[in-house]
Amino acid sequence: MFTFDDKEFEFKFSIGRIELIEQVTEMPTLSNINRTGGLLSIKDLKTYFAYALKEANSDVFFPIKKGMEMCERMIEEQGYEVVCSLVLEALQRDCPFFFQGV
């Protein structure tokens, strides 16, 4: 969970969300992480961020376009590494099957 513009947000990844992300990035998630050493391209980072973003305690996902804009602002204000770490930590938490035996 993290705070941005005085609101609480969280990421929620699932197999269904990953399928959507992989359609957009045209790259399997594990291949993307391995290929980049976990340092996703800005385009891919914005995609993972936006497709998994929810306001805290909400049942619905945040609008994707607004999520991409938020990601861009956070990268500019807090730094790429901070944002990438938030996304990867949530991915590890929600989809541990990607990281078994690694």
Question: Can you name each region flagged by the protein language model?
Answer:
Residues A52, A56-V60:
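Amphipathic alpha-helical interaction segments
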